[in-house]
């Protein structure tokens, strides 16, 4: 017993130190979130109390719950949680027929026993977050064994009905389908709530797929949200730690899983703030605009897809003026201008892409050469210029085919370029005569 007591004392000491730090978690001690058992029928290990986990019961059964309350002025990385109020209405761009408010968003993140949404994958921890009375509340429900899952899901069901929007990170594909499956398997019904999804993985990939090494939440938050986790338990280890708890009954290793999930919830709120600020055009009031040309262009293209046609031009102009813009970025922006009928800038961008590829004529310069060949042939009727660009594209394609055996698509492209060159030579000769 002395060893257990020493361990508990050390845990309590660590918690007290964290609570004395700026921005410490405020435990939910005043508001009852569910009926607490009034007798001693179920004994809860004192170790749970060291990280503010309580045993709760409802008409279905029991489960564990941890509740943390953050003040609205709490800063998580670059953003304060109070910014949700200003940013949330702009998130209506995800669902133009709905009006978004910060109070109507529920944030959801699961810790599960495995991957996929099949019957063998169980969410052993469900984290939810929401605004309440200018505070950001995080609730984390945990089951100590499978028999508690139904009670946990019943509690979640009661919470969901108060919200319209569900904010996740890959939740449209993973978290929410898994929750729905668990509701059905536990006899709690189907389609009990149909959320308006705010899945922030998709805009993250749209904007950062090439400028960040990974679009995992932990990487996005560090590189773009200014959030640095210390002594974090990786999400991939959460199932292992949970199974360890099931095997020996010691809850201590799960404290790190609770903390990991808690940070995920805060980061989800900050992503809502970031994308909301981008959509309402106020982002530069809070953080500097992106300084990488590709991120500028991808951000602008995403804003256009979200219906914010008036916002991207400044980003596009900045990207075009950057001397270090990659040829692929210039070609991407040129494709947008071509579609919009802005031929003058499209031509300038294609030409700039080729100039920037002078040391290495890569795929972007190849694409730019083909586009310029088509432009000068069909729009300007300058067959000599068109022939020059077509020859450059053919030479690149031919050299590439000698290094890597071409597939059917590449062979068809070579044949198309041969035909284009032959046609341009005929047109050029006729034009001279």
Where are the language model's segments positioned?
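N-terminal accessory regions of nucleic-acid-interacting proteins
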Residues: 1-102
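Conserved DEDDh/DEDDy metal-dependent 3′-5′ exonuclease domain
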Residues: 133-224
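Acidic, Mg2+-coordinating catalytic module of metal-dependent nucleases/exonucleases
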Residues: 206, 212-289
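Residues that mark the junctions of alpha-helical repeat units in TPR/alpha-solenoid scaffolds
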Residues: 292, 326, 365, 383-386, ...
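Structural register within alpha-helical repeat arrays
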Residues: 299, 332-333, 337, 372, ...
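Residue at a conserved register position within TPR or TPR-like alpha-solenoid repeats
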Residues: 303, 333, 337-340, 376-377, ...
């Amino acid at each position: 017993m002395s060893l257990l007591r020493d361990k508990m004392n050390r845990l309590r000491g660590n918690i007290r130190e964290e609570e004395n730090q700026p921005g410490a978690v405020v435990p939910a001690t005043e508001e009852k979130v569910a009926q607490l058992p009034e007798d001693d029928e179920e004994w809860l290990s004192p170790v749970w109390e060291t990280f503010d986990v309580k045993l709760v019961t409802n008409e279905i059964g029991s489960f564990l719950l941890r509740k943390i309350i953050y003040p609205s002025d709490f800063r998580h990385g670059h953003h304060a949680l109070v910014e949700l109020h200003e940013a949330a209405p702009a998130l209506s761009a995800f669902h133009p027929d709905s009006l978004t408010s910060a109070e109507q968003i529920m944030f959801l993140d699961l810790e599960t026993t495995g991957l996929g949404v099949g019957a063998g994958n169980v969410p052993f921890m469900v984290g939810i977050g929401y605004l309440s009375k200018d505070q950001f509340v995080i609730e984390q429900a945990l089951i100590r064994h499978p028999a508690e899952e139904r009670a946990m899901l019943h509690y979640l069901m009661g919470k969901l009905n108060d919200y319209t929007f569900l904010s996740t990170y890959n939740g449209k594909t993973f978290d929410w389908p898994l929750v729905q499956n668990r509701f059905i398997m536990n006899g709690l019904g189907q389609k009990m709530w149909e959320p308006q999804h705010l899945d922030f993985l998709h805009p993250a990939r749209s904007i950062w797929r090439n400028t960040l090494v990974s679009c995992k939440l932990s990487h996005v938050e560090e590189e773009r949200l200014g959030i640095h986790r210390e002594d974090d338990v990786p999400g991939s280890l959460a199932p292992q730690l949970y199974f360890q708890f099931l095997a020996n009954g010691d809850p201590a290793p799960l404290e790190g899983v609770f903390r990991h999930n808690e940070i995920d919830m805060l980061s989800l709120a900050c992503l809502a703030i970031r994308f909301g600020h981008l959509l309402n055009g106020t982002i530069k009031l809070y953080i500097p605009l992106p300084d990488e040309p590709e991120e500028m262009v991808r951000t602008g293209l995403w804003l256009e897809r979200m219906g914010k046609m008036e916002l991207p031009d400044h980003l596009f102009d900045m990207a075009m003026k950057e001397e270090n813009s990659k040829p692929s970025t210039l070609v991407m922006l040129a494709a947008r201008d071509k579609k919009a009928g802005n031929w003058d800038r499209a031509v300038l961008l294609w030409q700039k892409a080729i100039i920037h590829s002078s040391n290495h004529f890569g795929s972007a310069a190849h694409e730019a050469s083909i586009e310029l060949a088509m432009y000068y042939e069909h729009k300007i009727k300058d067959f000599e210029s068109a022939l020059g660009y077509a020859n450059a594209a053919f030479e690149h394609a031919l050299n590439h085919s000698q290094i890597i055996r071409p597939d059917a698509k590449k062979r068809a492209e070579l044949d198309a370029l041969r035909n284009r060159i032959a046609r341009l030579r005929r047109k050029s000769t006729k034009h001279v005569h």
